[in-house]
Amino acid sequence: MRVVVVGAGIAGLMAAQSLVKNGHDVVVVDKGRSPGGRLATRRIDNATLDHGAQFFTVRDPLFKSHVEKWIASGVVTEWCRGFDSATQNNDGFPRYRGVRGMTDIAKHLANGLDVRCNTLAFSIAPGTTSKWQLNIDDGSALNADALIVTCPLPQTYALLVTADIELPDSMMRTEYDRTICLLAVLNQSSAVVSPGGLQNPDETFSFVADNAIKGISSAVALTLHANPQFSLEHWDAPPQDVHDLLLKQAKPWIGEATVVTSQVKKWRLATPLTIWPERHWANEMIVLAGDAFGGPKIEGAALSGLSAANYLQQII
């Protein structure tokens, strides 16, 4: 079976890996420059910064079996067991990270797959020589017996306009929180303490990470995620104004250090506010998956991708 997967985040990559292992012909397309989606790591000079997902946890036995393989392969390691120093950073649940950054996980999963980045899916329509045709913005097209679409739901709606597929009303009303992220490289140690992560430390930020303490950066570099309220209120403000305000608000975490360089990254569709009750949704050999189905965490998205792949394999 020929399957095209739209989106090279963890949901799409997990689905593709599962299908390929079962002998199917799979192509993964993504508009980004590299696979990963929110498994995103950026390098600025000598600094390495995770600027999307900061870590992940494991609850489900199926996902745990995959994570154990990633650990054995040297791709993933435990970061800590909590971010509250009052409990000695230990609440019993490991937080995992990529050994050299979260994007390592995506690169590991993409290895051996036909992943085509810088490829923007434009529309889905019934095919002439296959069940479906995925049209690309450069005028080319990919034929498929089945499609797995893992991009955020607003982008999915746009793709399906020409496919004559009707989505449930509640799914079409799904909204997303936004996240504005400040990346700052420093000349000396920050005011963030071990293990290098702070959740909801103040009224501006939902997460602050020191990537050097975290263990992925040779230079001191902070990732600061503004919370949904701040991000929404300042989304359309002039970029320089947002940058300067975030730097001001970050001062308690920068401490006595000097900012060598800094930049802002914006995630418009960061976190779905409602979750579909099933791990995937399917109609006419088109399967929707991603964090809006499995839950707004790395584990949920991964399990959603596996669920989508399993569905297709069962109906063949």
How does the language model describe each region?
Residues 1, 137-146:
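Core beta-strand elements of the Rossmann-like FAD/NAD(P) dinucleotide-binding domain
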Residues 36, 144-195, 257:
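Central helical "cap/lid" subdomain
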Residues 244-245, 250-284:
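Flavin (FAD/FMN) cofactor-binding core of flavoprotein oxidoreductases
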Residues 117-132:
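A conserved short coil-to-beta-strand element within the FAD-binding core of flavoproteins
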Residues 183-234, 245, 249, 253-254:
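Active-site substrate-recognition segment that forms the wall
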Residues 20-44:
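Glycine-rich FAD pyrophosphate-binding loop
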Residues 41-81:
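N-terminal FAD cofactor-binding segment of flavoenzymes
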Residues 2-29, 309-313:
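N-terminal Rossmann-like FAD-binding beta1-loop-alpha1 element of flavoenzymes
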